[in-house]
């Protein structure tokens, strides 16, 4: 069984794992993400490679930013501001002589679902990741749809209010990231007390009606934009990911609000199935591996 080093580069940590082709995770750990400069970032990746170089067939990397996965080229690096117009794979291969692939993090999460998860049986669909912002990906003909400029599915930028279209206040990422959820609950509780996502769902699952109302207000806005994505793209399924997607209450409320939209539409349209992502915290690692395997399978 072949082993692969997979990395999920985030704004605070680089998670890495030694994974076999059958998705067995042999070892997993993390290191802080260098935020100061490119040199330290490259050196950190290479130090991880040094630990496993004699055990692996290649490196698969998930990263933020706008990425051309075929060239291994990054136009932007998301929170990693020192990455701009960078031949990332070429630079890494100078120090790590092995097969290397990189992909956008949300698109890697989608690849995990296409290859091994809850979107294996579709041709067209979407993935919505509810996190700090909104991660997104469109799936066309059973493949991630990158778009001409590799930025298709950047749902974070969707505007939700034309009265304030020039600021981020009503971007989908602001309204429906985790902070947006916390604010809806605080509004219902009429409290300035800060709660975590875990605490909110514990309170909701114990029957706190005000908390449930806050979650429902959040779910209604998520459902509205999911409806818009579907009407534009005609999805068979839409998978919802991110840590809070593990909460059945949230998925149920999103479905209920979507059904209400359909009921008042006045036209018959296909209702895509709404499913949680199978892979949660490991989605980017698994999806990066799927992209890597597909890349070198096509080159054989």
Model-derived features: positions:
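ATP-binding/phosphotransfer module of carbohydrate and carboxylate kinases, centering on a glycine-rich
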Residues: 1-58, 67-71, 92-98, 115-122, ...
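A short acidic/small-residue loop/turn micro-motif
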Residues: 32-34, 82, 151-154
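Glycine-rich phosphate-binding loop of actin/hexokinase-like ATP-binding domains
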Residues: 120-173
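A charged helix-plus-loop insertion that forms the helical arch/lid used to bind
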Residues: 73-85
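Hydrophobic "anchor" residues
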Residues: 24-25, 74, 144-145
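General beta-strand structural signal in soluble alpha/beta enzymes
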Residues: 100-106
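A cytosolic small-molecule/anion-sensing beta-strand core signal
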Residues: 20, 63, 140-141
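Short hydrophobic alpha-helix segments
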Residues: 29-31, 78, 148
